[in-house]
Amino acid sequence: MAYSFTEKKRIRNNFGSRESILTEPDLLAIQIDSFNSFIQADNKIKQDIGLHNVLQSVFPITAVNGYAQIEYVDYQLKEPKFNVEECKLRGVTFASTLRVKLNLVLFDKNGSTLKKKRKVKQIIEEDVYLGQLPLMTETGTFVINGTERVVVSQLHRSPGVIFEHDKGKTHSSGKILFSSRIIPYRGSWLDFEYDHHEHLYVRIDRRRKLPVTTLLRAMGLSSEDILETFFEKTPVKLKAKSCDLSMLPIHLQRTIAEFDIVVNQHVVVEKGRRITAKHVKLLGKAGIKSINAPLEYLLDKVICADIINKDTGEILISANTITSEEVLELLNTNKVKKIEILYINSSETGAYISDTLRLDETQTEIEARMSIYHVMRPGEPATEDAVNLLFNNLFFKNDRYDLSKVGRMKLNRRLGISRETGEHVLTNDDIIRVIKLLINIKDGNDSVDDIDTLANRRVRAIGEMIENQFRIGLVRVEKAVREGLNLAETDELTPQDLINSKPVSAAVREFFGSSQLSQFMDQVNPLSGVTHKRRISALGPGGLTRERAGFEVRDVHPSHYGRLCPIETPEGPNIGLINTLAVYAKTNSYGFLETPYQIVKNGKVTKEVIYVSAIDEITHTIAQANALVDDRGKLMDDLISCRHKNEFVLVDSSEVTLIDIDSKQISSVAASLIPFLEHDDANRALMGSNMQRQAVPVLKAEKPLVGTGIERVVAKDSRVCVTAKHGGVVEAVDASRIVIRVDSKKTKANELGVDIYNLTKYSRSNQNTCINQKPLVRTGDKITFGDVLADGPSTDMGELALGQNMKIAFMPWNGYNFEDSILISEKVVQEDRYTTIHIEELTAYSRDTKLGPEEITSDIPNVSESALSKLDEVGVVYVGARVKGGDILVGKVTPKSETVLSPEEKLLRAIFGEKANNVKDSSLRIGASKSGVVIDVQVFTRDRVEKDIRALSIDAERLERIKKDIDDEFSIIDGDIFRRIRLKLLGNVLSKAIGDIRIGERLSIKLMKKFDNKDIAKFKVENATVNKEVAVLVKQAKAKKVEFEKFFKKEKAKINEGAELPPGVMKMVKVYVATRKTLQVGDKMAGRHGNKGVISRVSPVEDMPYLADGSTIDIVLNPLGVPSRMNVGQVLEVHLGYAAKGLGYKIAAILDERRPDMVKQIRVFLDKVYNLHGKKEDLTLFSNEEIIELANNLREGVPMATPVFDGIREQDIKSLLRLADLPESGQEQLYDGRTGEPFDRHVTVGYMHMLKLNHLVDDKMHARSTGPYSLVTQQPLSGKAQFGGQRFGEMEVWALEAYGAAHTLREMLTVKSDDVAGRAKMYKSIVDGKNLTESVMPESFNVLVKEIRSLGIDVELEQH
């Protein structure tokens, strides 16, 4: 296999037994692809999706009078004014201007009013401004008002039809009541439900229920039509004493014979006997077409159609009448010989519709529609037109009802209609089919749906959500436009005059700013960002609420396999409602989640991969990824464990149709990063995957010794690393940028020959962690497309590195690791292993107040010189200044209201000109508990406000940086163009004298070296073709220069213009303070297996346990944390980590020996390490220099990869330990650092990747003096943010009671808590220097009294 530039530097030893046929898809594709399909920026011809689809559905808008119309033509998105970084800095939204091309068509008023025959009088075309559309950044986020936000995808119930039952919970009898619901994408919901009397009802939008026949009547069906639609008929010939039933024998099955059934004078079934399949067979063989039955059989049957007297035309018996003796008598009297009755077999089909029809009070179509109108619009007067309009708009009009493409597909599939497309509104046939299917389910001929399967839940991604917001905004615009169009001609209006963009802008802005699904991006480390973008939430508008969501909807469902991760979900109230996409999952065009499988044909695994949704998966038999397959792809076992119809079954290998693509297919990105996941309990794996997202990036990232092989994928797809856009050679590198000269073969015609990558240096993330990029390449390195050029936060050589590899021992140590506490060595702190940088942004605003403008200045009243020492003359802190709690960062004074001065004060003021008393100090100071170094200052000034010296110097610096980039870019491009010109001129004969070179002289390299590029451009040779080619290249160089000059002017104008600031703000100063935080007692740490704890002590190195070679342990963990938690993966990680480190030490020893055959030795040893088991590595592809570089990078340990559910075998860990000359047990003899004595037993020692979590004691430590109190109870508030107190609870009271500390206890429960009067007295006594405390009545007692009174019990306090 080919290795990339960074992979060659350090190979991870992969122990996976099966290599995936499919590479992991782009982890951010769900966000990026959805948004791109919404805006269709690259499409010349736009498809009917996204923004284009919305505009097409709303336009054309026609005037009420029909003489004017606005038509949609096309739309355009302009280039944003500022790039992403500038938007973050300025606090503005990264958005593009949306312009829509519209035609205002005016029709001739004298012509026809018919749509097709209208005569066009005038067309006015105009590009109309329709607001700002926030754009997605390359990383799948949005910058809204300067902060990065992520729009989380939503999992909601799919449009279509669903059949369910209440599990017998609705009615006291426990009877199961079946129901069905047609859910549109947009429009009224339609519910059909049975009551406990087995009558069928309909509800529209969950309103009052109506008999289902009312809806059928409203659709235009008569009683006869209804009965004919839902029932089979039995024709009956009436005789004097009997009747002949024209009935199929099958219709009699499972019924009890009400009379003797006679065939050829032989009784086949006796009266009172149940008719079985055997009887039906006999009747069928005899060819019976009709059965003779006594007239009594017709009693209690239902007549199918109206029976009319042929002579008079009157209805004798109406349809749906139950036959009685009177009815039979009436038939006999009127000599009716033929009737039709409904075929109702109590064991097979019920008479639900017939019974419901009898309840229905409506008789005609208009009555039925009136009935529906009264339910939908109670209290409103019902006219025939209004009634018809409402009914038709409910389900049958596109503008009010939309099933969507998904809804139609789901509806058709469930109703057994072969085609997947159709109208997006309901038809009469749809409604009838749904009712028929519901009756079938009730009769036991079909089953209800599983509402929690992913076949009935779909993902609504970002593109679809913005599309819906746009539709909401445009519908608001439509009303106003329709009214305005009437005046279009008389007032000579243009499309821009008619269309107000504010409703559209407001809808989009509201969605991004305040929607539950538009969230502040989790940016602690690269993994947290990737996971946030891949999150799928069932909450949000149109979704579930956490209070109402039951257990079933939160539970893991078999259809989640390979689509949603069964492990990664939050703990707490949102458990199961917020999920994460599995690694390979993607959404299809309908929004359903799909997962890839390899096709299996006749027991042989093919190379063909298909993506399957939960809808299609139900028919397949799917084998697991670990099924044994031989070299030819044949399944080796006869019986294979498979999934089929949501069950695990053992099937013959020939029955298998699909096989999993990879063992990690089931899990999410975070869960796939946990080595030995298969050995961890699910609850701890959940904590492990959640805690990895909280790991703070440390100063020097270190790759995990034990990984899973997906680390490189996460680092690349998170976009925190810098990857090469083209192949080429590294021209220049420094800490802040990388310049690549691109291979001329790799560039397209219009692309530049140089790539400049500006690195992000010490930038602040949303969670105040540090984003910093460090170059990995050196000048002269040859790189190819996709190579990692620079590491970002928490990445090491292009691999995700969230923590540090620490030497761990599992043993108790003087109680310091009681209850998951962690003991760490002082060496860890000294080596800055877990030192992190946190950057805080502090902002000062200079506002224009009623009393005059605030001023940013270093001249602040009543402030000492030392306090101002870190400010420049403008009043802004210097970059590089060390600041601590209370220091001024930006000096600012605010005008005070004028006080009335005495004549003496006025005189003094006039003499000394003292104005200090007119202003008060309102400077920006750093918080009392904070300290750090100022790393950056940005000053923004409003337009037409003069910039101060500091702002001008910052602007000049920025311009200088841009100019340097442009100059470097141009010099490389210019150099490349003239290198090509020299190559073309080489060997040609000069046709025009230049300087001291005569005509006819042949050009050589030496000759051309004497001339600069300016002169070379003037060379003319005898070959006309070469002259033309040279002229084209010279023209190209000039064009590039002009292009760069234009770009520089544009950037300069951007910097010089004023900033967009909030109303009333004249100037804004942003100060960035970086704080270095070392590991200390109280910080939270964790492994990747849910093994978390708090540091209890930082022990001196000399006191830590040590090994026989004198090396000390870094971290001591409690062995009791393993068995009950059942996360044994951490122990296996420690063993494998120990082997990895030991192998690194052996490689280091070979390198340090420097023997003549060192390279050969290293090759032999690396071959033993890498080709022990699992994926084979071909080291012959490496040159000797590359092998030595690889070996040097492996000094600190050979990184291992043990993929989830396909990990390293136990014997392989033992083989590696043996190869590293370490004990196979993974246990060593440890010695006590304090006494030097050996411990009683051997201890498990090894290396574990430990993380420092973003729960730092510095941020949590807090002490209250006095502060705010709760309004009702008058007790102190809780929490650091509210400057609250510590809760002194019931158990703490017991503790003080046990020690008899009566005075302390009284203080705690009264004056320190909610005794208002006592508090005031306490202050007074402290001021007076007295030590007396007197407690009065606590406020909580008054609250209790009030609560008792609210129950109607009068409580009064008697004074004694």
Swiss-Prot record:
Catalytic activity: RNA(n) + a ribonucleoside 5'-triphosphate = RNA(n+1) + diphosphate
GO CC field: DNA-directed RNA polymerase complex
Keyword terms of this UniProt record: DNA-directed RNA polymerase, Nucleotidyltransferase, Transcription, Transferase
A biological process from GO: DNA-templated transcription
InterPro entries listed in its UniProt record: DNA-dir_RNA_pol_bsu_ext_1_sf, DNA-dir_RNA_pol_bsu_external_1, DNA-dir_RNA_pol_su2, DNA-dir_RNAP_su2_dom, DNA-dir_RNAP_su2_hyb_sf, RNA_pol_bsu_bac, RNA_pol_bsu_CS, RNA_pol_bsu_protrusion
Gene3D superfamilies per UniProt: 2.40.50.100, 2.40.50.150, 3.90.1100.10, DNA-directed RNA polymerase, beta subunit, external 1 domain (2.30.150.10), DNA-directed RNA polymerase, subunit 2, domain 6 (2.40.270.10), RNA polymerase alpha subunit dimerisation domain (3.90.1800.10), RNA polymerase Rpb2, domain 2 (3.90.1110.10)
GO molecular function, one term: DNA binding
TM stretches of this protein: none
Top-level taxon of the source organism: Bacteria
The protein's enzyme class: transferase
Pfam families in the record: RNA_pol_Rpb2_1, RNA_pol_Rpb2_2, RNA_pol_Rpb2_3, RNA_pol_Rpb2_45, RNA_pol_Rpb2_6, RNA_pol_Rpb2_7
Enzyme Commission number(s): 2.7.7.6
Subunit composition and interactions: The RNAP catalytic core consists of 2 alpha, 1 beta, 1 beta' and 1 omega subunit. When a sigma factor is associated with the core the holoenzyme is formed, which can initiate transcription.
PANTHER family noted in UniProt: DNA-DIRECTED RNA POLYMERASE I SUBUNIT 2 (PTHR20856)
UniProt function note: DNA-dependent RNA polymerase catalyzes the transcription of DNA into RNA using the four ribonucleoside triphosphates as substrates.
Family per similarity comment: Belongs to the RNA polymerase beta chain family.
Identification of the protein by name: DNA-directed RNA polymerase subunit beta
Organism: Vesicomyosocius okutanii subsp. Calyptogena okutanii (strain HA)
